[in-house]
């Protein structure tokens, strides 16, 4: 973790900064909840659920909207040059009608440890960390009424659809 954190910090520039570094390690309660939920919802063993989690270590880069695609490409190239492997990319910044818009990547360190690296615009990060987070937390509670859950999902989509789409965002892919 210290090597990856240090390397990612070295890639920062004006307009491309790491955000929320204090939250890079998934909390113990959050991890336990995810293992329980995944083992139940995906009908897998607790061990299989634990082995499938790759965001115990997670980072977030905030990139300027206008230069998002170029900065993503620069950071990716620097990571790959240093021996990191891009495993997968989920780009919902190019989508509408979704509850969350961002770019979530899974990278593997040179020694084989997988971690998550999210990329956001200033607007998508602010939305994710504030209003969307509150709505998401309520929506995922088992006791949330289905009608209320549907209202929450509609509101998250409405908010996410209001975000600006970075130019050339379709170039952000594996």
PLM region descriptions:
Residues 1-42:
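Intrinsically disordered, low-complexity polar/charged tails and linkers
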Residues 43-174:
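Long beta-strand-rich cores associated with HINT superfamily self-processing modules
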């Amino acid at each position: 973790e210290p090597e990856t954190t240090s390397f990612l910090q070295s890639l920062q520039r004006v307009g491309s900064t790491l955000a929320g570094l204090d939250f890079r390690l998934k909390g113990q309660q959050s991890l336990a909840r995810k293992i329980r939920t995944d083992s139940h919802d995906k009908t897998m063993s607790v061990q299989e659920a634990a082995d499938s989690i790759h965001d115990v270590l997670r980072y977030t880069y905030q990139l300027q909207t206008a230069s998002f695609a170029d900065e993503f490409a620069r950071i990716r190239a620097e990571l790959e040059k240093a021996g990191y492997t891009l495993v997968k990319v989920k780009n919902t910044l190019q989508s509408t009608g979704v509850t969350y818009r961002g770019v979530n990547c899974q990278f593997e360190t040179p020694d084989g440890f997988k971690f998550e690296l999210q990329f956001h615009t200033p607007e998508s990060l602010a939305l994710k960390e504030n209003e969307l987070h509150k709505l998401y937390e309520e929506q995922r509670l088992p006791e949330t009424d289905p009608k209320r859950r549907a209202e929450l999902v509609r509101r998250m989509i409405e908010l996410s659809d209001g975000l600006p789409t970075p130019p050339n965002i379709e170039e952000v892919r594996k």
